């Protein structure tokens, strides 16, 4: 993708940030159903392309951003999916933006507020549920923030740059845990699940890694011999060498903790998930149009969003805590981003996001 620097004077976000909306779907929501005094809703989906100045103070906290590739204007590029449900007539809405921090790429807000059937691409009356948020007039927004989520099932994803140092690959020690729930599992992605990408091992030689197992967290780790496992995946029942998978021919014991420590390469700049949310919400609150003049979808004929609220369940609530605690609830002009946040059933933790080789989908459990 290519970006040009913009001099639009109407943009609220300064020259350190460029935003381009690529709208791919725009249509009436829920078969044109009318929701009380708010009326009909509109569905908008597509991609947002960002270009940010890595030398700006607004991005100084993003780990490895200075090691990311730059375009011809010195900006770092990345992109995210987005999804918006808004009143067809914004003037009939309540001028409130409600942002749902997706949970591992999944959209959860309508399930919990509207008693709706879950969908990552809500479009029907069934997906509107009881219509509660629509009758109240909210504009609903989703976007990607977790850079290791893989495409599929309508999940919200990001496309992040890979950091390098002086043109060379960055490597580092990383750790992965595997816990399976059933017998017969012989191979696992290094990320421990099928919807999260794995950091590539620099070598498939098992002597360069450490693989252990234990039944309980407090137990002593039992080494697994180098010859008893492989960096491999199964294809038609046969192991194929893979720097992204772990293969244990005797099978993983259900409930046991398997820990793999290995040297990985090519970390992506995960911290841009935090700035991407910040800059998107700031844009939707304050700007008339993006860098190329595409109108702000939540601003029309003098009607604009006056407040923004963030909601997240479990992992998503932990993201909101991290977002606030790290100082991202202030945009590049010192304005508040979210007026309120609601971390729902998220425990007391935060996400591990703005680190080299971050794995934001990981979370502590009593067993591991």
Label every model-predicted segment.
Residues 1-2, 48:
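A signal for specific C-terminal beta-sheet/loop modules enriched in small/flexible residues
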Residues 3-14:
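Short, Lys/Arg-enriched N-terminal segments with co-localized hydrophobic residues
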Residues 16-368:
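C-terminal His-loop and adjacent cap/lid subdomain of alpha/beta-hydrolase
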């Amino acid at each position: 993708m290519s970006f040009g620097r913009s001099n639009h004077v109407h943009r609220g976000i300064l020259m350190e940030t460029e935003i381009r909306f690529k709208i791919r779907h725009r249509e009436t929501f829920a078969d044109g159903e009318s929701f009380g005094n708010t009326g009909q809703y509109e569905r908008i989906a597509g991609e947002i392309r960002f270009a940010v100045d890595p030398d700006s103070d607004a991005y100084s906290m993003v780990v490895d951003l200075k090691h990311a590739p730059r375009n011809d204007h010195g900006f770092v590029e990345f992109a995210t999916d987005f999804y918006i449900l808004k009143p067809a007539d914004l003037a009939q809405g309540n001028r409130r933006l409600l942002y749902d921090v997706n949970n591992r790429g999944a959209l959860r807000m309508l399930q919990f507020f509207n008693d709706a059937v879950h969908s990552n691409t809500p479009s029907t009356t069934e997906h509107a549920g009881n219509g509660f948020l629509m009758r109240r007039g909210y504009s609903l927004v989703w976007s990607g923030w977790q850079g290791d989520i893989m495409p599929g099932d309508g999940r919200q994803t990001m496309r992040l740059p890979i950091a390098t140092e002086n043109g060379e690959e960055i490597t580092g020690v990383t750790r992965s845990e595997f816990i399976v729930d059933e017998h017969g599992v012989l191979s696992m992605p290094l990320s421990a699940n099928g919807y999260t990408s794995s950091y590539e091992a620099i070598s498939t030689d098992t002597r360069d890694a450490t693989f252990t197992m234990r039944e309980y967290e407090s137990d002593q780790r039992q080494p697994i011999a180098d010859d008893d496992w492989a960096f491999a995946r199964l294809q038609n029942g046969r192991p194929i060498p893979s720097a992204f998978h772990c293969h244990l021919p005797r099978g993983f014991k259900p409930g046991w903790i398997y820990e793999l420590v290995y040297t990985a390469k090519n970390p992506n700049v995960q911290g841009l998930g935090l700035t991407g949310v910040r800059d998107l919400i700031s844009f939707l609150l304050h700007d008339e149009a993006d860098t190329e003049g595409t109108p702000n979808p939540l601003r029309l004929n003098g009607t604009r969003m006056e407040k923004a609220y963030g909601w997240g369940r479990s992992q998503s609530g932990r993201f909101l805590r991290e977002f606030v605690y790290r100082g991202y609830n202030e945009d590049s002009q010192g304005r508040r981003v979210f007026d309120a946040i609601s971390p729902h059933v998220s425990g007391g933790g935060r996400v591990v996001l703005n680190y080299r080789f971050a794995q934001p989908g990981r979370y502590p459990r009593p067993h591991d």
